C-alpha cells in the first residue's frame, strides 16, 4: 500500500420512515449499486467533509442545506482497497416538509426506500455495513462513530472528544 488516500462523502436523507437511495451507475470506484448521495472530495475540500457533501448533494439532486433538518455527521470509515486507503464520511438528515426533490439525477436513479427494505438493496460493502450499524444503533443515539473495515464487517468505536482532559 502506497499511503494514497481517497476521501469520499455521502448523505442519507430520510422522510416518513423512508430513506432516499441512489442506484449509482458509472462510478469510478464501485459497480452499479445502491448508495447515498455523494462522491469524492475536491482538493479544496480535504479538511471539510460537510462542504464536500453539500456540493455533491447540490450537484446530484439540486438540494442545499436549507432543504434539510437534523443534519448530523455520524460515521467515518476506513478501508484498504486497491492499494489506497478509502475514507468515507457519512451524514444523515431529514428532508424538510414541502421540499420538492427533482426526480432526475445525473448519477443514476433515485428511490425512496422503506426503512425495513434498505438493507435488502445491493450496495457497496462499507456502505452496507455502516447502514446495518446505523439502522440497529446509530439512528437512536447522538454519537459519532469511527469504523475500520475488515473482511468480516466494520469494527466501530465511538469517537469522543477528550481534549478537555488531556493535552
Show which residues each predicted segment covers.
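Conserved N-terminal beta-strand and adjoining loop/helix that marks the start
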Residues: 1-21, 41-42
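NUDIX/MutT-family hydrolases
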Residues: 102-133, 157-163
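Hydrophobic pocket-lining residues within nucleotide cofactor-binding pockets
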Residues: 41, 95-96, 115-118
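Short, well-ordered beta-strand micro-motif
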Residues: 13, 90-94, 112-114
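Conserved Nudix-box catalytic region and its N-terminal flanking loop in Nudix hydrolases
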Residues: 18-58, 145, 149-167
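Active-site-adjacent beta-strand/loop module that shapes the phosphate/pyrophosphate-binding cleft
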Residues: 17, 77-100, 129-138
Amino acid at each position: 500500500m502506497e499511503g494514497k488516500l481517497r476521501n469520499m462523502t455521502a448523505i442519507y436523507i430520510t422522510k416518513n420512515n423512508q430513506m432516499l437511495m441512489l442506484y449509482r451507475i458509472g462510478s469510478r470506484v464501485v459497480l452499479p449499486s445502491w448508495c447515498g448521495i455523494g462522491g469524492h472530495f475536491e482538493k479544496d475540500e480535504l479538511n471539510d467533509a460537510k462542504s464536500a457533501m453539500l456540493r455533491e448533494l447540490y450537484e446530484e439532486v439540486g438540494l442545499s442545506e436549507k432543504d434539510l433538518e437534523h443534519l448530523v455527521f455520524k460515521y467515518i470509515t476506513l478501508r484498504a482497497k486497491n492499494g489506497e486507503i478509502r475514507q468515507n464520511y457519512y451524514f444523515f438528515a431529514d428532508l424538510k416538509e414541502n421540499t420538492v426533490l427533482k426526480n432526475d439525477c445525473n448519477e443514476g436513479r433515485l428511490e425512496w426506500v422503506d426503512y425495513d427494505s434498505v438493507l435488502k438493496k445491493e450496495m457497496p460493502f462499507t456502505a452496507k455495513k455502516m447502514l446495518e450499524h446505523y439502522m440497529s444503533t446509530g439512528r437512536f443515539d447522538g454519537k459519532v462513530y469511527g469504523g475500520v473495515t475488515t473482511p468480516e464487517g466494520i469494527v466501530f468505536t465511538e469517537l469522543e472528544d477528550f481534549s478537555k482532559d488531556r493535552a
